[in-house]
């Protein structure tokens, strides 16, 4: 029926009004006007001519109209704009705001180290290797003194006890590497090592495996993904490594990798996983079955890429506010 459809418009300029609520006397909403101001009552064929309809909109005065009057008005409802003057509002707060983020100083390492690999296992943080290099000293007087050294130590930090412990084993001296945890073991791979003269550095092809429960270490020399600053995640029975820097040219520019490899930690077999959309050395994090690549040291990218391990598809997950790399 024609009277089952009606329209709500502004009385001032006859502009259709959307999101007008039409209610019955019991405040039950029976219709909402669409973007053309139109609403339908065809589901309510039991309405009598004396039933009252209520029309409400946040910017207009409420109006009530009988169903009979709605039909007399040719199914058009006019609402008057509600011009309200709001009183001044003052907001007070006794909450003290800090100029800086609050932090707590915890137990320090016995010796400073950076560019190490780390894993979190049962409330304990393991860090291994890293650079202890210093220099150049007193750069204000252009000193040429420089000392480059990589660590061969592993440390364990107990979060609850705020206590550091040194693992008794000596590991390979390496830095800019990665590590992953699986089935009670820590897998350490990638990065670079120094020559005996400490003038030349080499990509480290060795994989070290530390068994936490047995407190033993063994080495595997099968690593097809040799790079520094590589990303890695552990997914189910596999360790997935991505990108990194393969070498550094004489002009100090890095040659970045777009390779991806999957290492099955049960069988020990390696598999090529394809190529990344761009060559990069990203920070990686695993969320469910997706690897998120954040930032990019190759030019300092702002994009966040996502790799779906179930479908093998790449997607752009967003952009950082600032370049990171």
Map each language-model feature to its residues.
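Short, ordered, surface-exposed loop/turn motifs in non-cytosolic proteins
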Residues: 4, 11-26
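A short, solvent-exposed loop/turn motif at the edges and junctions
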Residues: 54-65
């Amino acid at each position: 029926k024609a009277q089952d459809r009606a329209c709500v418009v502004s009385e001032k300029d006859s502009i259709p009004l959307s999101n007008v609520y039409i209610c019955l006397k019991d405040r039950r909403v029976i219709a909402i006007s669409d973007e053309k101001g139109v609403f339908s009552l065809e589901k309510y064929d039991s309405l009598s001519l004396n039933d009252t309809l209520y029309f409400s909109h946040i910017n207009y005065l409420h109006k009530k109209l009988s169903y009979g009057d709605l039909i007399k008005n040719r199914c058009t409802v006019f609402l008057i704009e509600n011009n309200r003057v709001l009183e001044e509002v003052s907001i007070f707060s006794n909450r003290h705001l800090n100029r800086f983020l609050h932090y707590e100083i915890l137990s320090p390492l016995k010796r400073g180290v950076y560019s190490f690999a780390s894993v979190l296992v049962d409330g304990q943080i393991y860090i291994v290797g890293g650079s202890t290099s210093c220099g150049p000293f007193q750069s204000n007087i252009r000193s040429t003194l420089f000392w480059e050294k990589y660590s061969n130590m592993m440390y364990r930090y107990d979060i609850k006890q705020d206590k550091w412990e040194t693992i008794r084993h000596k590991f390979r001296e390496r830095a800019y590497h990665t590590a992953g945890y699986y089935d009670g073991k820590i897998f350490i791979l990638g990065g670079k090592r120094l020559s005996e003269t400490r003038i030349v550095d080499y990509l480290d092809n060795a994989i070290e495996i530390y068994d936490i429960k047995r407190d033993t270490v063994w080495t595997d020399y099968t690593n097809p993904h040799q790079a520094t600053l590589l990303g890695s995640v552990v997914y189910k029975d596999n360790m997935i490594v991505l990108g990194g820097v393969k070498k550094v040219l004489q002009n100090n520019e890095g040659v970045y990798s777009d390779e991806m490899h999957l290492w099955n930690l049960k069988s020990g077999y390696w598999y090529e996983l394809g190529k990344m959309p761009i060559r990069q050395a990203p920070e990686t994090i695993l969320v469910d079955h997706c690897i998120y690549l954040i930032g990019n040291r190759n030019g300092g990218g702002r994009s966040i890429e996502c790799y779906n391990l179930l479908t093998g598809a790449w997607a752009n997950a967003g952009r950082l506010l600032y370049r990171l790399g």
